[in-house]
């Protein structure tokens, strides 16, 4: 049986560029080479695309602090709408390899917010993860909360501020509604980029200034007194939930540094030490959240478990990390799906969704096949 050619897209222009490099490195090292041939596409911080060699696509690949994309490789462009040969080498105008499926592992803005997904959809390529809509609404924490509330799911209490309306809410008004212990975060960032813990007016002003550096929309949320749990979801029309995992913090904030740079910043417990009843409830909520946001393929659902066992949905991440310490693959490993098998299943789901979409008839076909009753 011929191998499927998988294009792994990584890097990107967001603040999570280095996290994406780590994720790509793990996927490349773990993917089943008996089934798949890997083609590497690195996006540098200026937004240029490079086709990379598996032997030298990273610089300082073993150093999580200094890891970087090798930008000396060929620049490429993508041609939307073609059935095959969508990628060309810019300087030679040569068509590159034909791909069977794309595994995008670009985190953050322009990577998991629907932009890259739209480009791949226009290029007529199957790709792993959610479609344009699911990616976009999940990335925007404000929109995601609205949809989750509409689906009768409880979320962390919050107020959304923009550059236009920020003066309409005073600090005193906000703490009256949300309490004095707060988190401030950009609406469209991940990996805790731009997130601050707030305990007073001074730290609130500083947190807002930082968050608005990353986005034009900012969420101010109540700091929840509870446990931070995560559940992985996998599937398309019949999604399944993994066992739950818990983030046990050395203090009360799971920052970017604790997630990726400080191995002592947090302890990941998989499976979480919770009752079967609570675990089942979180799994059901995770699947409902996945479906409410129109997700497909994969997502990691982050929740808070309060002292009275109330479950509050915090975030839904449609492009979870695949680094050596990332929760998504760990949760599935604990649930009986190995890392290579997980990658294989995600690729299968991408192709499954692609061919299901190809079967949809066009609007012209509808009018040809349906008698509208018009004269």
Swiss-Prot record:
Function statement: Cell wall formation.
Sequence similarity: Belongs to the D-alanine--D-alanine ligase family.
GO molecular function, one term: metal ion binding
Amino-acid positions noted as binding ATP in the UniProt annotation, renumbered to this chain: 175-230
Entry's EC annotation: 6.3.2.4
Broad enzyme group: ligase
Reaction catalysed by this enzyme: 2 D-alanine + ATP = D-alanyl-D-alanine + ADP + phosphate + H(+)
Keywords: ATP-binding, Cell shape, Cell wall biogenesis/degradation, Cytoplasm, Ligase, Magnesium, Manganese, Metal-binding, Nucleotide-binding, Peptidoglycan synthesis
GO BP: any one term: peptidoglycan biosynthetic process
GO cellular component terms, A-Z: cytosol
Protein name, entry field: D-alanine--D-alanine ligase
All residue ranges annotated as the ATP-grasp domain in the record: 145-348
Amino-acid positions noted as binding Mg(2+) 1 in the UniProt annotation, renumbered to this chain: 302, 315
Compartments where located: Cytoplasm
Domain of life: Bacteria
Gene designation per UniProt: ddl
Database matches in HAMAP family: Dala_Dala_lig
Cofactor: Mg(2+); Mn(2+)
Pathway participation: Cell wall biogenesis; peptidoglycan biosynthesis
Pfam entry (one): Dala_Dala_lig_N
Free-text remark on how the cofactor is bound: Binds 2 magnesium or manganese ions per subunit.
């Amino acid at each position: 049986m011929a191998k499927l050619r998988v294009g792994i897209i990584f890097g990107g222009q967001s603040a999570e560029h280095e996290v994406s490099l780590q994720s790509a490195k793990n996927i490349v090292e773990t993917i089943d080479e008996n089934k798949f041939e890997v083609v590497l596409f690195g996006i540098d911080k200026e937004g240029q695309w490079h086709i990379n060699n598996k032997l030298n696509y990273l610089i300082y690949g073993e150093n999580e602090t200094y890891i970087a994309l090798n930008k000396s490789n060929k620049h490429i462009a993508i041609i939307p709408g073609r059935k095959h040969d969508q990628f060309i080498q810019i300087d030679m105008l040569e068509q590159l390899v034909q791909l069977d499926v794309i595994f995008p592992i670009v985190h953050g803005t322009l990577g998991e917010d629907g932009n890259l997904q739209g480009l791949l959809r226009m290029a007529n390529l199957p790709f792993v993860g959610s479609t344009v809509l699911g990616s976009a609404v999940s990335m925007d924490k404000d929109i995601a909360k609205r949809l989750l509330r509409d689906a009768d799911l409880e979320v962390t209490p919050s107020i959304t501020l923009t550059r236009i309306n920020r003066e309409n809410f005073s600090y005193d008004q906000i703490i009256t509604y949300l309490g004095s212990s707060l988190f401030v975060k950009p609406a469209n960032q991940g990996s805790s980029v731009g997130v601050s813990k707030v305990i007073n007016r001074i730290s609130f002003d500083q947190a807002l200034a930082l968050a608005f550096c990353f986005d034009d929309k900012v969420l101010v949320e109540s700091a929840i007194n509870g446990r931070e749990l995560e559940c992985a979801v996998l599937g398309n029309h019949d999604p399944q939930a993994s066992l739950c995992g818990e983030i046990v913090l050395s203090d009360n904030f799971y920052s970017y540094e604790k997630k990726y740079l400080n191995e002592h910043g947090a302890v990941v417990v998989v499976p979480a030490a919770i009752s079967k009843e609570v675990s089942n409830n979180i799994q059901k909520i995770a699947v409902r959240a996945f479906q409410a946001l129109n997700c497909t393929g994969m997502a990691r659902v982050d929740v808070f478990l309060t002292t009275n066992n109330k479950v509050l949905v915090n975030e839904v991440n449609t492009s979870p990390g695949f680094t050596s310490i990332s929760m998504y693959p760990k949760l599935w490993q604990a649930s009986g799906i190995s890392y290579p098998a997980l990658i294989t299943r995600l690729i299968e789901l991408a192709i499954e969704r692609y061919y299901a979409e190809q079967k949809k008839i066009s609007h012209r076909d509808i009018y040809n096949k349906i008698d509208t009753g018009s004269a």
